[in-house]
């Protein structure tokens, strides 16, 4: 079967490609020089965020062509399908109703009723633990809460908990364990008191290898430190759809919180999976986080595409990936507390859109999901920004910044923000050889020195970026930011005609990992495995034969 091309999807694709070729000869600097109102025209605000997308390789014709693509992809109709609960996850025949997790007002659907009941139950638990009413097996107040989960049960809650550090109530300390590497849980429990520790086991199936093994280790640690079997229920809560498995583990049925099939793991932080967030910042702030996301849902549903933040973010990334040949994007939050955001968005984007077949199963002949990476500013300036400025690869960037800080060190926040803006400006304008030569001449350097050094000081510029601003990092603005990226991912999936809500590649990795572990346990290595895999397993078996 012949692979699907974008020309098969979009009748004006030749015009889009021709326009992309024309942009190869243009510069952003010239675009700004020609239009004093460019920044104002290419900025849009909603839900406490402002997106400045003026430093992108676009003009009015670009946007017109991209809106044509969106129209042919039926993006507006697709948005309605997502938000009303149509089965947009076609390979698993499910809706993707993460927006229902943050509904506001009175419940309107059965899903809303389930969400409200779970939130009410969560609120009672958190109040009980924070107040000291909930006690451990020695009758002491819980001081530490440990979330055991991986992927969507870890990255989102961990990121949000770190991001909202200024809002921590201080009632308990929240920790996270994800890795199957025992070093993580071993190191963590060395600093905890078993009698005052509560574990949250977050696994929809209650069978995820990493989560189950870490939970078994946590249970053994409790038992080894004097907790009786019949007291374990005071130290374990589960978020799972498999109540019977959680009860068999030793968790009281009333302490099992639901997660539903209509929520994907990487979209689930708004549910009971977000319990560690609520333990850290309290239910009021958790609900503000949900409210911020709901405001972005409303914007996504109602705003025209040309003024729609998530749609524009998706269309711009489509432009770079599918038209201008980029295969990576950088997320650079200039906020220390957002240091885990790139890792969270890495999963959100790459697990969602790392697909190579259309929704109907046809191979694609075009690039889909891009590689997402980054770190917090200004740290990245002293590591990988060199490549962004002078490397041969064009990397579209999202700069994220706050206008105000939570801390009193205003002068440091000034420098943080200044560096964010300066980086986006420098990447756009660059520095030509004549300017570099003039600077060196002013420094008294000889013509010979200038000729030798000048080429190394040239910065080509013309590197694109978005800047996303918020007044302050709060539960509301963070909720809106995350929802914007969720909907950006969906927009891209619609434009590429792929399913953004399954993850069969992850499932294959889990299966093969189990097969290799069995081979290690039995020393029965299948002869039809490749020689590399056989050799690696033999080396591990030999190294551990006496343990």
UniProtKB/Swiss-Prot annotation:
Pfam families per the UniProt record, alphabetical: PGI
The encoding gene: pgi
Record's protein name: Glucose-6-phosphate isomerase
Cell compartments where the protein resides: Cytoplasm
Organism of origin: Saccharophagus degradans (strain 2-40 / ATCC 43961 / DSM 17024)
Stated family: Belongs to the GPI family.
Main subcellular location of this protein, as a coarse class: cytoplasm
Protein's pathway: Carbohydrate biosynthesis; gluconeogenesis; Carbohydrate degradation; glycolysis; D-glyceraldehyde 3-phosphate and glycerone phosphate from D-glucose: step 2/4
Reaction equations catalysed: alpha-D-glucose 6-phosphate = beta-D-fructose 6-phosphate
Active site: 351 (proton donor), 382, 510
SUPFAM superfamilies: SIS domain (SSF53697)
Any single Gene Ontology cellular-component annotation: cytosol
Enzyme Commission number(s) of this protein: 5.3.1.9
Top-level class of the enzyme under EC nomenclature: isomerase
Single GO BP term: glycolytic process
């Amino acid at each position: 079967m012949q692979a699907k091309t974008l020309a098969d999807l979009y009748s004006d694709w030749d015009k889009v490609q021709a326009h992309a070729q024309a942009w190869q000869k243009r510069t952003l600097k010239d675009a700004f020089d020609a239009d004093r109102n460019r920044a104002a025209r290419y900025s849009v605000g909603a839900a406490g965020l402002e997106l400045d997308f003026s430093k992108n390789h676009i003009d009015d014709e670009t946007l017109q062509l991209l809106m044509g693509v969106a129209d042919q992809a039926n993006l507006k109709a697709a948005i309605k399908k997502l938000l009303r609960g149509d089965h947009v996850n076609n390979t698993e025949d499910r809706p993707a109703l993460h927006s229902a997790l943050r509904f506001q007002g009175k419940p309107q659907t059965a899903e809303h009723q389930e969400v409200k009941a779970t939130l009410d139950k969560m609120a009672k638990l958190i109040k009980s633990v924070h107040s000291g009413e909930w006690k451990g097996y020695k009758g002491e107040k819980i001081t530490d809460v440990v979330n055991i989960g991986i992927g969507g049960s870890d990255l989102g809650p961990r990121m949000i908990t770190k991001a909202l550090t200024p809002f921590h109530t201080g009632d308990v300390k929240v920790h996270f364990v994800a890795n199957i590497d025992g070093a993580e849980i071993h190191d963590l429990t060395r600093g905890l008191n078993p009698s005052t520790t509560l574990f949250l086991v977050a696994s929809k199936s209650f069978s995820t290898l990493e989560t189950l093994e870490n939970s078994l280790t946590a249970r053994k640690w409790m038992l080894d430190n004097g907790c009786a079997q019949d007291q374990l229920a005071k130290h374990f809560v589960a978020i799972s759809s498999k109540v019977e498995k959680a009860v068999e583990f030793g968790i009281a049925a009333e302490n099992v919180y639901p997660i539903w099939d209509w929520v994907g793991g990487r979209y689930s932080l708004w549910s009971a999976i977000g319990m560690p967030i609520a333990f850290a910042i309290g239910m009021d702030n958790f609900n503000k986080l949900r409210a911020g996301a709901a405001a972005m849902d409303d914007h996504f549903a109602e705003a025209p595409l040309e003024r729609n933040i998530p749609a524009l973010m998706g269309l711009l990334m489509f432009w770079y990936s599918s038209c201008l040949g980029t295969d990576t994007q950088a997320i650079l939050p200039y906020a220390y507390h957002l240091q885990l955001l790139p890792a969270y968005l890495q999963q959100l984007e790459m697990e969602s859109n790392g697909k190579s077949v259309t929704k109907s199963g046809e191979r694609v002949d075009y690039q889909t999901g891009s590689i997402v990476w980054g770190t917090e500013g200004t740290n990245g300036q002293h590591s990988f920004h060199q490549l962004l400025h002078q490397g041969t690869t064009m990397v579209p960037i999202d700069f994220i910044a706050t206008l105000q800080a939570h801390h009193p060190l205003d002068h440091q926040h000034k420098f943080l923000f200044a560096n964010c803006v300066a980086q986006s400006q420098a990447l756009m304008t660059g520095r030509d050889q004549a300017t570099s030569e003039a600077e060196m001449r002013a420094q008294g350097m000889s013509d010979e020195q200038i000729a030798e050094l000048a080429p190394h000081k040239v910065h080509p510029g013309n590197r694109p970026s978005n800047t996303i601003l918020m007044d302050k990092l709060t539960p509301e603005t963070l909720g809106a930011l995350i929802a914007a990226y969720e909907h950006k991912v969906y927009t891209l999936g619609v434009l590429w005609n792929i399913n953004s809500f399954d993850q069969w590649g992850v499932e294959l990795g889990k299966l093969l990992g189990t097969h290799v572990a069995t081979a290690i346990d039995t020393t029965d290595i299948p002869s039809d495995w490749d020689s590399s895999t056989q050799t690696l397993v033999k080396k591990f078996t030999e190294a551990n034969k006496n343990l």
